[in-house]
């Protein structure tokens, strides 16, 4: 009985701590809390709104109970550091509200007949949900098993307690076995929080990790290998043609050199023969007698 009473009191304290967050207030109430900033809530973009909410919650005096208070404050501060997509973070609250109304107008006739809440009546958490910044979480009391090695059928007094920090981070905690003491939340590392945010915010993984290289599919890899092989074959064929032209030119030059050497050898031998043979002077020209008539008759 004492353990069941401790579980109920702990659940009540956690619900009160969650209700004290600005995320559960309406936008009119948030405007009242942010009234000192001097800027209208509708003209703020989502990035400025989340930063303002985070700063206001950080400056508020801590009135939480000892049991689970530090974990709830840590989860709310993690909400303020949420990474928004670039196109959505630059939109103002009025523009986001217009987009939400357009999506509602495109729904069914039954949804259009329902009472349409105004912008001031909507909570900040609902605005972020409908804007697509966060996704709704399903309660894990009926589906999730115990965490930390406990069994599902360990007893009626050991019911599973789920602590929800913000609308998109959930972690489990179990009551202490020996005595009903303060429940400490199951530790969630920064890496687990980043994985849960990236998995629940669909379509934002490319924006959050711009440096990550996408894994190439098998078809792209095959095309790349095929192009590389074709390029290698072309390079080999071009190198073979170049070697053939070079060999033909070298062979032609060798033939010309051999012909010139033969001609040079022939001329050298002819010159040596001319030196060995005696030089005969050319014969004198013969004188011929001519008949002339010098006496008259």
From Swiss-Prot:
SMART domains: BRLZ. The modification Phosphothreonine is found at residue 118. This is ABSCISIC ACID-INSENSITIVE 5-like protein 2. Coiled coil: none annotated. It holds the Pfam family bZIP_1. SUPFAM superfamilies: Leucine zipper domain (SSF57959). The keyword DNA-binding applies. It is found in: Nucleus. Residues 253-267 are annotated as: Leucine-zipper. Keywords: Abscisic acid signaling pathway, Activator, DNA-binding, Nucleus, Phosphoprotein, Transcription, Transcription regulation. One of its GO terms (cellular component) is nucleus. One of its GO terms (molecular function) is DNA-binding transcription factor activity. PROSITE patterns: BZIP (PS50217), BZIP_BASIC (PS00036). The modification Phosphoserine is found at residues 21, 43, 81. The keyword Nucleus applies. DNA-binding heterodimer with ABI5/DPBF1, DPBF2 or EEL/DPBF4. Interacts with the AFP proteins AFP1, AFP2, AFP3 and AFP4. Residues 100-119, 138-157, 272-297 are annotated as: Disordered. It comes from Arabidopsis thaliana (Mouse-ear cress). Belongs to the bZIP family. ABI5 subfamily. Predominantly expressed in seeds. Residues 227-246 are annotated as: Basic motif. Binds to the embryo specification element and the ABA-responsive element (ABRE) of the Dc3 gene promoter. Could participate in abscisic acid-regulated gene expression during seed development. Residues 146-157 have a biased composition (Gly residues).
